[in-house]
Amino acid sequence: MKSLILAEKPSVARDIADALQINQKRNGYFENNQYIVTWALGHLVTNATPEQYDKNLKEWRLEDLPIIPKYMKTVVIGKTSKQFKTVKALILDNKVKDIIIATDAGREGELVARLILDKVGNKKPIRRLWISSVTKKAIQQGFKNLKDGRQYNDLYYAALARSEADWIVGINATRALTTKYDAQLSLGRVQTPTIQLVNTRQQEINQFKPQQYFTLSLTVKGFDFQLESNQRYTNKETLEQMVNNLKNVDGKIKSVATKHKKSYPQSLYNLTDLQQDMYRRYKIGPKETLNTLQSLYERHKVVTYPRTDSNYLTTDMVDTMKERIQATMATTYKDQARPLMSKTFSSKMSIFNNQKVSDHHAIIPTEVRPVMSDLSNRELKLYDMIVERFLEALMPPHEYDAITVTLEVAGHTFVLKENVTTVLGFKSIRQGESITEMQQPFSEGDEVKISKTNIREHETTPPEYFNEGSLLKAMENPQNFIQLKDKKYAQTLKQTGGIGTVATRADIIDKLFNMNAIESRDGKIKVTSKGKQILELAPEELTSPLLTAQWEEKLLLIERGKYQAKTFINEMKDFTKDVVNGIKNSDRKYKHDNLTTTECPTCGKFMIKVKTKNGQMLVCQDPSCKTKKNVQRKTNARCPNCKKKLTLFGKGKEAVYRCVCGHSETQAHMDQRMKSKSSGKVSRKEMKKYMNKNEGLDNNPFKDALKNLNL
């Protein structure tokens, strides 16, 4: 009898097979005398669509809403059904005695495996592999400490409740809004509050009125002393009068105070912090950061589990620090890492805190030494950031003397503040940091002359627009960006981690860009006309970050066995009914900002102009019509003059190709040029290359020229 190991991806299955010496490769799995290891391809099973409950629901109609199934159905995803059949056969195989779930150690990973097992009707015992890295050592250690699968039942119930709630709310709210206003509009418990966050910030900026104010400083022996005052001076004349009173008046050093202080490194990275820093440093978006991090985790095995919300490590990891430091010796930080090899680490260090680690600890290097030449430029940047933060956390604090010199002149107090580094500590890892020396020439009681007075003009600045990094942080801490009626709600938002999860926030932002609810201009995220109208048309409670936080709080309670999933789902059903009825009874109107005067050839309604990756197209405003029409698109045909790609306008014989250089030619001329160029002889390789490149494009001249050739 054998144990069947179910991994989430083929790459992880290969890692497990390698770690456990499961060497016999089969079709869709690996095998040895003790284990069989197979894999999902992400989700193999998903929630059924409305039309899979009732074929009449394929057409979107307002009168059919709300759609609330008595029992939720799941279906096998068509494109991965072959692998599902393989997994199913293995689960039901008589030689398999039990199942070891080895999907990602988290809510979504649990759902991936359990949906498959439930769909198959598994009755065999379940064990759980729960690890935070996929190195050979971590896998082998994890298999020595397999858990009873029943310990994770509540995690599964929470994952299933989240999935079903999102389906019930999302399907109904989106269909209701879309059919009510004849527009492709989408609502969701996470995406709609995120639009509201961006909109609130945008309104704050638009309503901001800058205020002018002034500051005064004195220069003494080359040092600038700032006027100490509890008020902001908005009247320049007040400071000018003060300057007049200071003329020909000497000052006196009232005190020189030195206080020794320490500063400590930032917390270890969680996913959100890492995504934010990658955008701040390199303008790399959250989605790209997560994909790169996943590659470092799965392919290179040099970092721990990516989707974590913790900034801390567990105390049982203390003994692993040395081998992780050893791995970082391959980086440019080897000189800073080397002294740490002789240091003794204690579980009392601030980075170790079991209470602040739930599913996964902070993102840190594994014990695997990276082959730096194998890392892409983006992977290298990300790995360096993780190593830098990790080594800083293990280094001594930065120490400095905070010097405060107080000057009195004509009854006014001016202050000079300087920090003098005495011990670099963790800051030694940063380029350009060094020990500083300040030969400050002041002693208490000194009489000093003022060499210069400076009145500086300032202006208050509005809040900054969100970028992809700061929006992530706002989703994590929305209580810092919105006004709440009750302070207790701020605590709720803080405890639940805000809107969405570390694993989903990047996807939500990406989705909002794709549905044209938000846009980024020069790195500034703004709400589009469509996004603003979604907020106006959506039920008010669905735009609030508080509601989704309260839901997330209940999901966490389900995960901990303190709330019934069934109760939560019933609450979501009642909420959905209210949302749908509210939309049905609304008298608000939706105005397309991209509506054209072109009539749809199918239904006669006016069409909407939308941007695509390669150009523009017209789409019928009625979502049930689905008529589309190309307006313009980039082709692979090249301009004969400047060799740039030509843009195709129109269709059929009316089509025209234009270039940015001014060149233009008709479809007939293009056909003739391509035919002449080919001379009736085209290699099979060239034909395949162009046919694949232009697959699905209408009016493709090269494709047309090739299709009748006999090869």
Swiss-Prot record:
Positions of region (Interaction with DNA): 186-191
An example Gene Ontology molecular-function term: magnesium ion binding
Region (Disordered): 691-711
Toprim domain location: 2-135
Pfam family for this entry, one: Topoisom_bac
Signal sequence coordinates: none
Top EC group: isomerase
Catalytic residue list: 305 (o-(5'-phospho-dna)-tyrosine intermediate)
Every Topo IA-type catalytic domain range: 152-580
Keyword Acetylation on entry: no
Any one annotated GO CC term: cytoplasmic replication fork
Site features described as Interaction with DNA, chain residue numbers: 60, 167, 175, 307
Function (record text): Releases the supercoiling and torsional tension of DNA, which is introduced during the DNA replication and transcription, by transiently cleaving and rejoining one strand of the DNA duplex. Introduces a single-strand break via transesterification at a target site in duplex DNA. The scissile phosphodiester is attacked by the catalytic tyrosine of the enzyme, resulting in the formation of a DNA-(5'-phosphotyrosyl)-enzyme intermediate and the expulsion of a 3'-OH DNA strand. The free DNA strand then undergoes passage around the unbroken strand, thus removing DNA supercoils.
Similarity remark: Belongs to the type IA topoisomerase family.
Name used for this protein in its record: DNA topoisomerase 3
Native source species: Staphylococcus aureus (strain USA300)
